[in-house]
Amino acid sequence: ILQSISKFVLAAGNLFSGTFKYTSAGLGGTGAVNFGQKYFFETRPTALQVKYRAKVEPVDLNILKGPLEKDTQDKARIFVAIVDWTTQHTVSSTYVLFGSNNGCVGAWDPETTKNPGEGQIIGYGSLWLTETTSASDWQNAKIQIQWYDQTTKPADGNYSLVISCAANAYGDYMNGCSKNYLHIDDT
């Protein structure tokens, strides 16, 4: 269960392949997500299949100047990326009460970025969710992978797989609805 929460800032419910580190700093801190997992592919995948349930409501927080205005429809998101990265890609969100260095660094989108700096994105699949589903019925999704490169495969030992499921698509900007949730099963 991925659930958004808000005390002073928005903590987007997020499930992803990679690591997370939080560093406290007075009345706030920095959360750093390191995207990417080493994974060996025998064959090239064509899609990511998941079951999901979601509650997606209008935006009530926009702490770090994200793209969604308050009272507009929030978005949840599930995406997969097949990558050829030498290191994980880091996204850092910093918020300290009365701080002057608040912001988001490293945000990326596989739909619009072919290389965020660590190596190329070979292909991606993305599902944007803007509506609440039934709380009791699981929705089936088959997220097709779109290929930027039809032949390259990740180098042995490189980071090759990114999966991200977020109750708030722009949670790295602390931008979204604090009441959203996204339940994921059968990935």
Stretches found by the model and what they are:
Residues 48-52, 56, 145, 157-172, ...:
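Extracellular beta-strand-rich recognition modules
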Residues 1-44:
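Surface-exposed, low-complexity/disordered Ser/Thr/Gly/Pro/Asn-rich loops and linkers
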Residues 67-72, 176-178:
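Short consensus segments that form the blades of beta-propeller domains
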Residues 2, 38-57, 64-70, 83-85:
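Solvent-exposed strand-to-loop "edge" motifs in beta-rich extracellular domains
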Residues 61-64, 92-93:
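Short, solvent-exposed loop/turn and secondary-structure capping segments
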